[in-house]
Amino acid sequence: MKKITVTLLLTLICSFAYVQAQTTQPSQREILRACIKVNDYFMEKYADYTATSNVGRVRPSNIWTRGVYYEGLLALHTIFPREDYYKYAYDWGSFHKWGMRNGNTTRNADDHCCGQAYIDLYNMCPSNPEMIRNIKISMDMLVNTPQVNDWTWIDAIQMAMPILAKFGKMYGEQKYYDKMWDMYEYSRNTHGGKGLYNPEDALWWRDADFCPPYKEPNGEDCYWSRGNGWVYAALARVLQEIPADETHRNDYIADFLAMTKALKACQREDGFWNASLHDPTNFGGKETTGTSLFVYGMAWGINKGILNKEEYLPIITKAWNAMVKDAVHPNGFLGYVQGTGKEPKDGQPVTYTSVADFEDYGVGCFLLAGSEMYKLK
């Protein structure tokens, strides 16, 4: 009986220690250490920023996956400036002549994504307008043509929407904000018949293929984690740029708040989110990219006073601590990253040791999350 009591006591102590570790807000030093470790691993492995990727076919290094990475790197640079970070980003943009994969006439948001990093680099030292010339030409083309139906998959909202917001702020011209809303509103309310956003669940179908009657194996709608993470991050990045009196600011905030509530409800017990937000049986398990994007958005919302800190700080603390504990390897490799795709079954397997087909965007998402976690008071 005495042995059973001691064993039970030890179990309770260990359980308490685990819960406490999950919910203890990390220090800035700890957050920075994790970000530096993950980024240093990537920069060492991919030291040649000019190298093409050869997954299925040859792609240049300014595609969306790398653009997302540089968004994260430059966010890290803002909280921990290092010359090698800046040089790694600047030299990459310079190598590509500050251009996009398919030139200035592309309407493909995946091509536009690199423009976010180009603009961020330009804003750090606005002495060379060539850095933003090409991406501005492409955005002006969107603004000056009537089409609004380019963002037919929700990833596109993150890849391109913040660029229009950045130019609206930079030039003080409403036309960028207006076009941004028109394209967002079409994706939200019209594409696929009734739009890609389901206001009942406050989550998004990835593209028209997943609109009803499509269902997950458990009968629920298919809400892909990373896809919803892209929209959630985009809303944060847009709200960061637009003025308080922008016509549709309250609409964006309403969607951001609704998504936040929905995401809170489907967080896993261990702190991560599943690849499928409403069907944990469909390739369920820890997944780092969606989790990182949700942490980024919620941390940003807390930092800006849009989200209640008391309610949401425990959510993101649990998620961040879980990623650092379970996904970050001692050498900085980032595990549980789902490979490229459009739904839960793609990019599998997702494990501690699995290497995604592209390693860059997962690191970028993690750095975005860490950079906002660092700013928490």
Language-model region placement:
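Extended ligand-binding clefts on enzyme/binding-domain cores
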Residues: 154-155, 165-277, 284-295, 307-341, ...
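CBM-like carbohydrate-recognition segments
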Residues: 9-10, 23-67, 75, 79-95, ...
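Surface loop/turn signatures of beta-propeller and other carbohydrate-active proteins
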Residues: 33, 37-41, 148-149, 207, ...
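Bacterial Sec-dependent N-terminal signal peptides
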Residues: 1-24
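Asp-box/WD-like beta-propeller blade repeats and closely related beta-sheet repeat scaffolds
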Residues: 129-164
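Helix-capping and short linker residues that terminate individual alpha-solenoid repeat units
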Residues: 47, 81, 97-101, 126, ...
